[in-house]
């Protein structure tokens, strides 16, 4: 098992990033690949969780150990796999998640992609009280960059689709942000907050 990787970030796609270490390029699935935009061709440290399946070996990456810890607790719940847990971590509202679990707010939990009533109830049952302290939000994980708005919005929508959100939900998001100028990372964060509000 791997705990973290240090290396040069060489590629960003809608679903994953590539970090080169010792001559090997590691494909790492992350919640919001565009949050790494300003780190291309720079040294990064990514915290990892490895999933080994019969047909694939996958690496899931995180900005911090706290984010990884939330992910690990989520995948311990029956009915939540790594992809769903990553979509939940992507919302970047860990306080809201912890409060919803501790207060049995099933409606809030069902707003996450692929989380139905049974799974939301299981989350409450398995995780209530497991978060000693709500994870800290990292407001300045990485510096922001300015890019062309349409391209950035397209990349954000593509990343949200990769997280499991439906195209019909994202049509409203696209319409809301048309004419604005943000980075893909900022679009994703804002869109996730809107999607969680319902």
Curated annotation (Swiss-Prot):
Disulfide bonds: none annotated. Residues 1-63 are annotated as: Domain I. GO terms for molecular function: ATP binding; four-way junction DNA binding; four-way junction helicase activity. The keyword DNA-binding applies. SUPFAM superfamilies: DNA helicase RuvA subunit, C-terminal domain, Nucleic acid-binding proteins, RuvA domain 2-like. GO terms for biological process: DNA recombination; DNA repair. InterPro entries: DNA_helicase_Holl-junc_RuvA_I, Hlx-hairpin-Hlx_DNA-bd_motif, NA-bd_OB-fold, RuvA, RuvA_2-like, RuvA_C, RuvA_C_sf. The keyword Secreted does not apply. Has three domains with a flexible linker between the domains II and III and assumes an 'L' shape. Domain III is highly mobile and contacts RuvB. Belongs to the RuvA family. The RuvA-RuvB-RuvC complex processes Holliday junction (HJ) DNA during genetic recombination and DNA repair, while the RuvA-RuvB complex plays an important role in the rescue of blocked DNA replication forks via replication fork reversal (RFR). RuvA specifically binds to HJ cruciform DNA, conferring on it an open structure. The RuvB hexamer acts as an ATP-dependent pump, pulling dsDNA into and through the RuvAB complex. HJ branch migration allows RuvC to scan DNA until it finds its consensus sequence, where it cleaves and resolves the cruciform DNA. Homotetramer. Forms an RuvA(8)-RuvB(12)-Holliday junction (HJ) complex. HJ DNA is sandwiched between 2 RuvA tetramers; dsDNA enters through RuvA and exits via RuvB. An RuvB hexamer assembles on each DNA strand where it exits the tetramer. Each RuvB hexamer is contacted by two RuvA subunits (via domain III) on 2 adjacent RuvB subunits; this complex drives branch migration. In the full resolvosome a probable DNA-RuvA(4)-RuvB(12)-RuvC(2) complex forms which resolves the HJ. This is Holliday junction branch migration complex subunit RuvA. It comes from Streptococcus equi subsp. zooepidemicus (strain MGCS10565). The lineage of its organism: Bacteria, Bacillati, Bacillota, Bacilli, Lactobacillales.
